[in-house]
Structures are given as structure tokens and as C-alpha cells.
């Protein structure tokens, strides 16, 4: 295979990208494990904002996820891959390798992340202004528990409305406990996000953004180079954003810490005390930007009726 800086590699990538029609305009790739309680909401929402296919990687789930995703499987909207051994990044790169000619754009998300445009536009319509980039980096908004010890009887998008606002994100100087084993993040963790990539131009994908590309820049929504987690990172999410329901309830956060990292199974178990300290950062402001968008989608999809079955 040509190297990432090879002119031939870039030429091949650009040649592939000359294709003008794709089976899917915007797909999402995600790896999951025992997420059955959340899958229907997540799938419903993303279908509603313009996602027309899902590449899902099942990490040895033991719950009833197959029943939950059955309606989307029946409509041909999900490509399901069993992925019980390899970690998250390997799944992402498998997706690029196998499906680069199937989707114009692929967004890499977790099941607690919800991509949308605050303008109310469909995301594929927004993406038309970013043709030529290898990846569009979308900053996230981090949501806390809102004081909920357990999950309320409501969709995630309705239940959690307290977050770290833009001013707090830009000023974040919380010491996330950098250590040699990388078991905790470093300062600037809130100034992060995920990427929507042109899979023909990306050579290798990491969790948050491409590790290497064949051609094309990696830019944010304002067409600026990405300064991920940097002190002077120009965080902006007025065009596209990701609501990251990082903790959900305190009970769910505790379980998340106990499960460990899906991205790196060799990473030592995280510190619950430090993660609870992080969570306390994320409840200072109320943000309901997504609520009207979600309610419109839920009504159109008859989500409440489907949820009660």
C-alpha cells in the first residue's frame, strides 16, 4: 500500500472520490456493548437528522439488542458486524476499509453521543459546504448527571439538560490526572469531539479524528485547523455539534468506570473518584437546544408508541 505521503496514494484517493453517487449519503459507525436500553433512541434520533445507514460493531453484547435493532435491520439500514475481540479503533478502520465506497460521509460516534445541527438543518445538507475536506471535526458539549442518581424514566435527550457551557469549555483547566499508564485524560478534555470523515481520503482513523489521511485537510466547522484539547482551541458548535451524555446518572457512570475502556482493553481501570470529580464540572448550565429537534423527530417516528411495545 502506498505511504500516506505518497503522491500515488493521494492520486488513488482522489480518483476514488470522483464517484458522485453513493448508496448512502451519511452513515454512522459505532461499536457497542450491552446498550439495548439506549439503542432505539439513538437510532431514531440519527435517522431523523439525516443518517441513512448505520455500521454497527457488536462487542459481545449479552442483552436483547437484536430485538431493539430489528426494525432498522428489516429496512436494510444497519450493517451489523460481530466484533468481540478487537478494540474500537480497529473497528473504525475496518469500517473505512470495507465501506469507503458505500457512503459519502461516515461519522464515528459512541452510543452516548448525538450529532445534530443547532440550525435545525439536516446534517447531510450542512455537509455539502465541506466537500474536499478529509474530515470535519465536530466539538462536543458535555452533559452531566443533572443530580440524577439513577436513570429517569425518560429518553436520554429529555432526561439530561445540564452541561458544561461554551465559556466553561474554553476555560477548562481541570487536572484530569495525566499518568504514565494514560488511565486518565489531561487538561482540556472538554475541548474535544468526534469526526465526520470522507472515507476515501482517510488512511487511518483514531477515536476522535483521523491519524493519517491520503489527501484533504481536517477542519472544524469554521474551516480552521483542529486544535484538539489545546488551551487556545477555538471551540465552536453553532453549525454542528455533538451532545455527549458522558455520565448519564451517577449509577450509570459508576458502571461505566467498572467496565473499563472499549478503546483500549489494556488500559488500567479508571479512578472512580476522579471521574466523579469530572462529572461535577458538567452541571453548571442548562442547555435544551436539542429538545425541539428531538421532539419533532420522535413525533414523526412515533417513538413513544414504539418504545412502549
Describe each model-derived feature in a short phrase.
Residues 73-88, 166, 170, 189:
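Conserved donor nucleotide-binding strand/loop of the catalytic core
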Residues 44-53:
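Short, acidic, metal-binding catalytic loop of nucleotide-sugar glycosyltransferases
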Residues 52-60, 81-84:
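Short beta-strand/loop segment that forms part of the nucleotide-sugar
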Residues 93-105:
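Active-site nucleotide-sugar/metal-binding loop of Leloir-type enzymes
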Residues 2-11, 15, 117-309:
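Catalytic-site signature of metal-activated, phosphate-bearing donor transferases
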Residues 58-74:
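A conserved acidic beta->alpha catalytic loop
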Residues 1-44:
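N-proximal low-complexity "stem/linker" segments adjacent to membrane-targeting elements
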